[in-house]
Amino acid sequence: ASDVYKRQLWVLLAVSSCCTSAPLPPAEEQSERLQIIDTHIHLYDTNRSEGVDWPPVTDKVLYRPVLTEHFDEVADREGIASTVIVEASSRPEDNQWMLDLVKHNPDRYLALVGSLPIGTDEFSSLLERFSKDSRFVGIRMRDRPGGDDFFTDAVWRDLGLLAGKGLTLDVLINNFTIDEVAEVAKRLPDLKIMINHLGGLSITNDPLDIKWKESLKNASQYENVYCKVSGIFQRAGIKPTPKERSFYSPVFEIDFDAFGEDRIVYGSNWPVTDRGGSYAEQLNIIQGYFNPPVKRLKDSIKGGLIA
């Protein structure tokens, strides 16, 4: 398993131990090297002869080639040092396509959270194959075949295989619930689980859903559960997409209170961010809220409190 997604990721928001047992560099060196790592982008090529699994042709914003040269332009402009790619296809061979696509620049393209058909006879051999590449650091549960009957014995078996290899499970809450994340975390305490996109809440000007807050707090009690502050524009339940930090701050606060500095990471969800605004706009909103926690984090590093 990779030391990349599983090591301490120096990100905008915090240092995520989600992923590691690797020793840290000296404290002085850490604070000097604090960099932004975007842990959630998508890459795909709509010009491939076999087409793409996503996005659909009807998506006028996203249906275009989105490749390394396009993200490099964004990253260079916005000061993003490195990134983790998250699957955008349910086709197993697209994992290899992605790994091949980014092999020319391992310093920027650190890792892939891939897609494998969990709960099937093919899962074990595919996991064995792709996990031999240290950049393949886990999978994402996005689709939910079987509906309410998704969590079969075969699914639990495969989640156990994932945990046994020290890999990470990303979860898109659209088709799953935070309570289900908590159940997986309870049954498989060695499986590192990353909740995507703030916990999946649709953010409006209404009071935040109490049940959602309670579920998130409950899931956070399991130390193998982490949260991505990602896809903030996609979580906005009103249009046009708000650009005021105050609109997102209540959810930021709940996520931060639940998971703290050590179990939150930054992810943009680029290029899906383009549906709501620019990369810089979402980054500035997140930076504006989380900069004080980062200052506290830097101070604790200097004080030798993080080891």
Q: Predicted regions span which residues?
A:
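Short, small-residue-biased leader/transition segments that mark boundaries at the very start
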Residues: A1-Y5
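Mid-to-C-terminal alpha-helical segments outside catalytic/metal-binding sites
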Residues: K6-W10, C18-T20, P25, E29-T39, ...
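Mid-domain alpha/beta scaffold segments of enzyme catalytic cores
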Residues: E28-K165, N284-Q287
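Short beta-strand segments
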Residues: D38, V84-E87, V113, K228-G231, ...
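Active-site beta-loop-alpha junctions enriched in small/polar residues
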Residues: H42, A88-S89, S115-G119, M141-R144, ...
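Short catalytic/ligand-binding loop motif for oxyanion handling, primarily in non-cytosolic enzymes
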Residues: D45-T46, P92-N95, D148, S202-I203, ...
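Alpha-helical elements of Rossmann-like donor-binding domains used by nucleotide-donor carbohydrate transfer enzymes
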Residues: H70, W97-D100, S125, R129, ...
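Catalytic pocket-lining loop regions of alpha/beta-barrel enzymes
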Residues: V137, D148-V265
